[in-house]
Amino acid sequence: MSKGIITLFLLSNFALAQVDIELPELGDRVSGAISEAEVELLSEQFLQQVYSQAALIVDPIIQEYSELLLYRLSETSLVNDRNFTVLLIDDPSLNAFAAPGGIVGINGGLFLNADNESQFASVLCHELAHL
C-alpha cells in the first residue's frame, strides 16, 4: 500500500512539473501597468523630493565620469529610454538607486568603497536593471 502511495505522489509531482506556467513580464513598463505620463509625473515628484531633502555632490568631473559610464553601460542593456538624470548624493553609505524616468542616484560612499571601476560599474548595471 505504501509503495503505491509513494508512486502516486512521485507521478503527481512529475506531472505538475510539466505544466506550462506563464510568468508575468517583470519590469515591463509598456505592458500598461503605468503610462508614460505617470512615469513623467512620478519622476518630477521624485526629483523635487530629492532636491529638497538630500545634499548633492556638485563636482563636474565626477558628474561627467558617472554619466559617461552609465551611458556606456546602457548601450548593452535593455533600457530603451537613455535620457538619464544622474544624481550624486552626498552620503558616505555604500548605496545607489534607480527611480522612474531614468533617474539614477549614486551615493558618495560608492566612490569611496569601490576598489575599482568594475565594482563601481557593477552597481550601476544593477541600477540599470531597475529602469
Where are these regions (language model features)?
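Peri-catalytic and regulatory segments of divalent metal-dependent proteins
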Residues: 18-131
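N-terminal signal peptide c-region/cleavage motif recognized by signal peptidases
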Residues: 12-14
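Exposed boundary/loop context
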Residues: 8-10, 36
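Sec-dependent signal peptide recognition
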Residues: 1-8
